[in-house]
C-alpha cells in the first residue's frame, strides 16, 4: 500500500506530528523551499493509538475522527508505526472466513 502520511519524530523517537504528502507535493521540487523546516508542513494527527489499546477502542477512534490512518505510540509517545482501518477490517474479514470454513 502506498502511504501518504509520514511521522515527524524527534531524536528520541517521540511523535511530534505528521506530514501529509499532499501538503508537500506542490513545494517538493521548488528549490527556494528546500531550507524550510518540515514543521512548516506538520500537523497534529486527529488522534493517536496506544500500543496496547483494544481493537474496539481503535475502531471507535477511527469512527469518531472519520479517518482511515492513525499513528501508534507507546506510553512515552514514542512513534511505533501507523495502523489503517482497512488493515483491521481485512484481518477481521479473514478471521470470519476461517470461522466459516
Stretches with model-predicted labels:
Residues 22, 36-37, 86-87, 100-101:
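Short low-complexity, flexible loop/linker segments enriched in glycine and/or proline
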Residues 20-23, 34-46:
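Bateman (tandem CBS) regulatory domains
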Residues 1-3, 9, 28, 48-68, ...:
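The conserved cystathionine-beta-synthase
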Residues 7-8, 13-21:
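Helical hairpin unit composed of two closely spaced alpha helices linked by a short loop
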Residues 15-18, 78-82:
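Glycine-rich acetyl-CoA-binding "A-motif" of GNAT/NAT acetyltransferases
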Residues 1, 15, 36-42, 50:
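Cytosolic regulatory domains of K+ homeostasis systems
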Residues 31:
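Beta-strand/loop-dominated core regions that host nucleotide or nucleotide-derived cofactor-binding catalytic loops
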